[in-house]
Amino acid sequence: MPNQHPLLSSNLLPVGSNISTWWNFGSMLLTCLALQTSTGFFLAIHYTANINLAFSSMIHILRDVPYGWTMQNLHAIGASLFFMCIYTHIARGLYYGLYMNKWVWLSGTILLMLLMATAFFGYVLPWGQMSFWAATVITNLLTAIPYIGTTLTTWLWGGFSINDPTLTRFFALHFILPFLIISLSSVHIILLHNDGSNNPLGTNPDIDKIPFHPYHSYKDMLMTTIMITLLFIIMSFSPDLFNDPENFSKANPLVTPQHIKPEWYFLFAYGILRSIPNKLGGTLALLMSIMILTTTPFTHTSHVRSMTFRPFTQLLFWTLIATFITITWTATKPVEPPFILISQTASVIYFSFFIINPVLGLIENKAMMTK
């Protein structure tokens, strides 16, 4: 069958025999995307994009709609699993030098930004306390743009404050962006199949390739099954694991929560934003925390593609992971000592990875050439 059908034969390409479990996260991300789109569709059927009815419509979905609680919890927990998979996927790309496949990496970075935008718009929709205030804080960052900032913010809000028009357009954007993500995911996969996948050794896989199906397709199915099992376990036993307690109260513009914070998957970027006392500087740092990923294909200096055989670069990589976790943790804390200093130090270390990595590559090259 795969040999006969052109669509199947073009997608089930031979792959290097030694690709590890870290290569399964692409298919897991596609599963998450399918799950989020389908559950989101059923939620959109019952949701009302009105500031007076949005919170009530969420309660209606949970209590009155048959299996509405399943759809709502799958969608909320699925978003967290989506980001767990995408961050692992990016970390794998950094570790094994997959960013050298430039167009795949750049399209992936755009996908990440689209996904973050979609998740942000979705977080506003329940119109709970944290939804409202997170939207207020993040959209307010647009005012930091010189000259046009205030006009741009008013245009986005559809008025002089976050109100009914804001919720309506956020719902429209949250509905349409996943289809853009699906389209760009297709481009991402086509670009990957253009050059083929890399492997843990960073060597040319052409000398030892095996059919994708059944060898790697079953491996993909195993990891996807584990992920879906984990999703259902969380949904059954701890459905509110990733939810903020503040969001169980309806949005009140007159009462500010003690500590405004977005969902956990935005905390590292939010932590970098908060660590800089200047509004414009913080906004630029927030953007750069994601945009800096686009520099890696152009700053790779090592003769060796993967970090598998580069112990010093491995140390640098795991420092980056520890820094990412530290920034995420500090962003959950109030803006007071010692968290301000920890956050600032961690932010400097985060960005310095992308500067030290090329320098370390040159040093390694020099060391390998000396006898």
Swiss-Prot record:
PROSITE patterns: CYTB_CTER, CYTB_NTER. SUPFAM superfamilies: a domain/subunit of cytochrome bc1 complex (Ubiquinol-cytochrome c reductase), Transmembrane di-heme cytochromes. The keyword Protein biosynthesis does not apply. Pfam families: Cytochrom_B_C, Cytochrome_B. Keywords: Electron transport, Heme, Iron, Membrane, Metal-binding, Mitochondrion, Mitochondrion inner membrane, Respiratory chain, Transmembrane, Transmembrane helix, Transport, Ubiquinone. One of its GO terms (cellular component) is mitochondrial inner membrane. InterPro entries: Cyt_b/b6_C, Cyt_b/b6_C_sf, Cyt_b/b6_N, Cytb/b6-like_sf, Cytochrome_b, Cytochrome_b_C_euk/bac, Cytochrome_b_N_euk/bac, Di-haem_cyt_TM. PANTHER family: CYTOCHROME B (PTHR19271:SF16). The cytochrome bc1 complex contains 3 respiratory subunits (MT-CYB, CYC1 and UQCRFS1), 2 core proteins (UQCRC1 and UQCRC2) and probably 6 low-molecular weight proteins. Component of the ubiquinol-cytochrome c reductase complex (complex III or cytochrome b-c1 complex) that is part of the mitochondrial respiratory chain. The b-c1 complex mediates electron transfer from ubiquinol to cytochrome c. Contributes to the generation of a proton gradient across the mitochondrial membrane that is then used for ATP synthesis. This is Cytochrome b. It comes from Elapognathus coronatus (Western crowned snake). The gene is MT-CYB.
